[in-house]
Curated annotation (Swiss-Prot):
One of its GO terms (biological process) is methionyl-tRNA aminoacylation. Gene3D superfamilies: HUPs (3.40.50.620), Isoleucyl-tRNA Synthetase, Domain 1 (1.10.730.10), Methionyl-tRNA synthetase, Zn-domain (2.20.28.20). This is Methionine--tRNA ligase. A motif ('HIGH' region) lies at residues 11-21. It catalyses: tRNA(Met) + L-methionine + ATP = L-methionyl-tRNA(Met) + AMP + diphosphate. GO terms for molecular function: ATP binding; metal ion binding; methionine-tRNA ligase activity. Its cofactor is Zn(2+).
Length: 614
């Protein structure tokens, strides 16, 4: 058994999330986490809403609310959407908790004490019309490296390089288009050059990463410069140093604090586990260390899931923070109270999802929100599309015609039809799983196929090849469908022994396929598991709890959590024998067939949304 940390990118609370977001961080991380739990590993899946930074401040001003009011609103929207999609977080929290503030400030103080957070004078942008600070990501211009006209003041999304706003060609404000004025300002910088040797040595051992992630990360080593980790802004975590902590206009950079969220969420999870246990016993408030502190004899692995625009922060900034905290750069140093912390085992980056050939854009109305999708369609239909046709290793396109086709042809007519006709024949002819007679070669062959699927699909999931994994699982479904068609049980009414054997074999094969598909289709999997008389929980669902801030009783907020292994019997990743005599009721359709009309209806919704914003 391994301790598996599933660290999932934190969605930003400047609005509801669309399906492109969950295709990058959400569904892939949940598929992996569900499989690893079923395979017997101790999984800790954590994330939360990212609530600091300039976009929150600007949007709050536009809406006439405080940043906290804005993030409170969208935190609840995002929590509901991700829970309804079935994302099985052990803890989904937020970055405005007192716990998160304390963990981030401890990290900053220790990195600073070890000599890797250095104070420098830099050029900051001012809006000439308002006299206010203009944060770097609200400045755009032409990238001095690749020439892309649309680069931000902190990063070029075209070439992925980190930038300084003052280096942009023809810089302009994204708020009103004016040219900013640059003045001197003081900031703390993460000294990446002092951590370069340790960072490079670690990265060169990551040969198992996806090539696009590894190559991009290694290329970043060619131009390592100190990176500003504070900002001229009044919304964020205070800088925890004398002379800085009381300055209302200086805050920690949102990306410095966001990546630390994986650690702070793990700590909050452990504290809540202790609280739920009555403050004593196991698990306790230090339980998070089993995933984070290197421990001899304990296999610990950490997987970070995100879209490709966040690779830099997870393969460079976060590892550099961890190395600086441990004192493993050129200046040495000692770890802080959390001890040495594990570096990422793997950074799992997805590419971008587009829709109908266009980039998602909420401002232009080119968007399909998760909550709208789930209001009209089954969550497993969206999960399946992302798994089988999502942007795993290259950009992919979501179209309504393809969504309808895959739902109808593969889920309804393929997997759903197999479940329905098998259960219907068992119910009609026996009312329960029949006792099998002697199996023929054709029966043994189909069971050998389904049982082989556990190793094959599992191997693909462990190596982050989810598209190949779900394709293989559906290939096995096709073999079982072929078996039922070729054995023709509907023609065996006068041969009860043979009919019983075929239907027992088919039921066993369907049960096996259901386990193979459970990480991808958890809602359907649990329904099918129960319909076939299965015991225990095959695909546990998350729940939303309203909790009080652990360090501020005046604040409450929703979290996503669940009982996925602890306190429940989780069906394992293996073939479990169906039991003769188990009652089988007449089934209801598992998946809903989509009418051809939905394609034009959804396209019209998108056109109307775009017209409103034109």
């Amino acid at each position: 058994m391994s301790h598996i940390l599933s660290a999932v990118a934190w969605p930003y609370t400047n609005g509801p999330r669309h399906i492109g977001h969950v295709a990058g961080f959400g569904v892939p991380s949940d598929v992996f986490s569900r499989y690893m739990r079923m395979a017997g590993h101790d999984v800790l899946m954590v994330s939360g809403t990212d609530e600091h930074g300039t976009p929150i401040l600007v949007l709050a001003e536009q809406e006439g609310v405080t940043p906290q009011e804005l993030t409170d609103r969208y935190n609840r929207v995002i929590v509901d959407d991700l829970a309804n999609l079935g994302l099985s977080y052990d803890l989904f929290t937020r970055t405005t908790t007192r716990n998160h503030y304390a963990v981030v400030q401890e990290m900053f103080r220790t990195v600073h004490k070890n000599g890797y957070m250095v104070e420098q004078t830099t050029m900051g942008a001012i809006s000439p019309s308002t006299g206010r600070t203009l944060p770097d990501r609200y400045i755009e211009g032409t990238c001095p490296i690749c020439g892309y006209d649309g680069a931000r003041g902190d990063q070029c999304d075209n070439c992925g390089n980190q930038l300084d706003a003052v280096d942009l060609i023809n810089p302009r404000s994204r708020i009103n288009g004016e040219k900013p004025t640059f003045i001197e300002t003081q900031h703390f910088f993460l000294d990446l050059p002092a951590l370069a040797d340790a960072l490079g040595a670690w990265l060169r051992t990551r040969t198992h990463w996806r090539p696009n992630v590894l190559n991009f990360s290694l290329n970043l080593l060619d131009d390592l410069r100190p990176r500003a980790m504070t900002r001229d802004i009044d919304w964020g975590i205070p800088v925890p140093l004398p002379g800085w902590e009381d300055n209302p206009a200086k805050r920690l950079y949102v990306w410095f604090d966001a990546v630390i969220g994986y650690l702070s969420a793990s700590i909050e999870w452990a504290r809540r586990q202790e609280l739920a246990a009555g403050g004593a016993g196991t698990p306790d408030a230090e339980a998070w260390r089993a995933w984070w502190n290197p421990t001899p004899g304990l296999d610990q692995q950490s997987y970070y899931f995100m879209g490709k625009d966040n690779i830099t922060f997870h393969s460079q900034i976060w590892p550099a923070e961890l190395l600086g905290y441990a004192g493993k750069g050129s200046r040495g140093g000692e770890p802080g109270i959390y001890g040495e912390l594990n570096l990422p085992t793997e950074v799992v980056s997805s590419e971008f999802l587009t829709t109908e050939g266009k980039q998602f854009s909420t401002s232009r109305g080119v968007v399909v929100y998760v909550r709208d999708m789930l209001a009209r369609y089954q969550p497993d239909a969206l999960r399946y599309f992302i798994a089988v046709a999502g942007p795993e290793s290259s950009d992919s396109d979501f179209t309504w015609s393809e969504f309808k086709r895959r739902t109808n042809d593969e889920l309804v007519a393929g997997w759903g039809n197999l479940v329905n006709r098998t259960a219907t024949m068992v119910h009609k002819n026996f009312g329960a799983v029949p006792e099998p007679g002697e199996r023929l070669a054709v029966d043994e062959a189909v069971l050998a196929t389904t049982r082989a699927g556990f190793a094959q699909v599992g191997r693909l999931l462990e190596t982050q090849r989810q598209r190949a994994a779900v394709t293989e699982a559906m290939r096995v479904v096709g073999e079982v469908n072929k078996y039922v068609s070729e054995t023709e049980p509907w023609k065996l009414k006068t041969d009860r022994d043979r009919l019983a054997t075929v239907l027992h074999t088919a039921t066993q094969a369907v049960a096996d396929c259901n386990v193979l598909l459970a990480p991808f289709l958890p809602h359907a999997a649990q329904e099918i598991h129960s319909a076939l008389g299965g015991t225990g929980t095959l695909a546990p669902q998350p729940r939303v709890d309203e909790v009080t801030d652990l360090d501020d009783a005046s604040r409450s907020y929703p979290i996503i959590t669940g009982d996925y292994v602890r306190g429940e019997t989780l069906a394992p990743w293996e073939s479990a024998a169906v039991v003769a005599g188990t009652p089988i009721e007449k089934p209801s359709p598992v998946f809903t067939k989509l009418d051809d009309a939905i394609v034009e209806e959804e396209l019209e919704r998108m056109r109307a949304g775009a017209a409103e914003r034109a």
